[in-house]
């Protein structure tokens, strides 16, 4: 869920309303994590009138731990949940998370259903045709395999001829295409990509032996390896050729280009969180310090 998520073709308004309805649930009030965060006057003043006095609606694929998942009371929790609560506090408002299939999140903004896309969504040049991104995270992709690593996987370069799973419509699909081309260019068998609807589906494919490995966002892969089955289900593969993950990129809050005032307000809020130390505190809380950005940029990805 950066899942560094990347949509191969931008979803347009014409996506069926029936599809949106079938892949979304009602709003969920996020467990509050903004205690002690004070309103930033400049950021709050920049928030456009139409977004004041009501919660900001966030489209997000849940679960995608540690970024967003449900606690025992089915309240959304996770780093991105905490961050959005803190952003909202800086703006003097609230947020509501709405569970949405990843490949319909952009369409949900275009239809007016949601205001923000927050789901470990990669800031890509292609997406920038439709959305502006306030970047708050930088991460790559990593592999997890069955615990014990029975196939002795050392990295993408050793997976020629194997089946690797990932989430459909994710950035990792293109990473696997590139790795597969490297295989075939070298006269080896291609990598078979098993693209599945959700993070849970991809995990289950590896556990069931339908895929040798799962390529996911580095932070999610590390968390899954540590937590799933109390650490007994999966193992993180650290590739010596890419110790920090494959093709690191920026992740951000997605906002429709038409809502440039909202983008500016969120950028000011994130900058304030970085300045007052809240941002670093939240990263440390989720053991994600290595994925920090130095400043709140808009559309930081240039190619």
Which residues does each predicted region cover?
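A ligand-binding cleft/hinge motif common to bilobed small-molecule-binding domains
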Residues: 121-128, 175-179, 212-247
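Bilobed "Venus flytrap"/periplasmic-binding protein-like clamshell domains
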Residues: 65, 76-89, 142-198, 203, ...
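Acidic, polar ligand-binding/catalytic clefts
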Residues: 94-158
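Ligand-binding clefts/hinges and TM-proximal coupling segments of bilobed small-molecule sensing domains
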Residues: 30-41, 45-46, 171-191, 267-303
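Extracytoplasmic small-molecule ligand-binding "clamshell" domains
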Residues: 33-120, 285
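Periplasmic-binding protein-like
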Residues: 138-145, 229-268, 289-303
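Secretory targeting and sorting signals
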Residues: 1-30
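Extended ligand-binding regions for polar small-molecule ligands
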Residues: 34-38, 84-85, 89-90, 149, ...
């Amino acid at each position: 869920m950066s899942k560094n998520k990347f949509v191969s073709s931008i979803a347009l308004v014409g996506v069926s309303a029936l599809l949106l309805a079938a892949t979304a649930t009602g709003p969920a009030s996020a467990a509050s994590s903004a205690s002690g965060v004070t309103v930033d006057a400049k950021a709050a003043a920049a928030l456009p009138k139409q977004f004041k006095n009501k919660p900001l609606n966030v489209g997000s694929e849940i679960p995608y731990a540690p970024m967003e998942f449900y606690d025992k009371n089915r309240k959304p929790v996770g780093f991105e949940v905490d961050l959005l609560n803190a952003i909202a506090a800086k703006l003097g408002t609230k947020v509501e998370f709405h569970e949405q299939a990843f490949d319909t999140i952009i369409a949900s903004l275009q239809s007016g259903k949601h205001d923000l896309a927050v789901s470990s969504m990669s800031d890509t040049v292609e997406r920038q045709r439709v959305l502006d991104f306030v970047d708050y995270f930088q991460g790559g992709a990593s592999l997890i395999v069955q615990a014990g690593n029975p196939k002795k996987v050392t990295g993408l370069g050793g997976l020629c001829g194997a089946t690797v799973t990932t989430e459909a419509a994710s950035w990792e699909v293109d990473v696997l295409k590139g790795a597969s081309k490297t295989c075939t260019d070298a006269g080896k068998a291609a990598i078979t990509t098993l693209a599945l609807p959700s993070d849970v589906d991809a995990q289950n494919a590896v556990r069931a032996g339908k895929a040798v490995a799962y390529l996911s966002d580095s932070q999610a892969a590390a968390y899954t390896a540590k937590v799933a089955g109390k650490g007994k289900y999966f193992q993180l593969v650290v590739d010596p050729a890419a110790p920090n993950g494959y093709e690191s990129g920026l992740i951000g809050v997605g906002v429709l280009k038409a809502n440039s005032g909202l983008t500016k307000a969120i950028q000011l809020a994130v900058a304030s969180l970085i300045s007052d130390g809240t941002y670093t505190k939240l990263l440390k809380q989720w053991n994600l310090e290595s994925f920090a950005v130095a400043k709140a940029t808009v559309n930081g990805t240039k190619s």
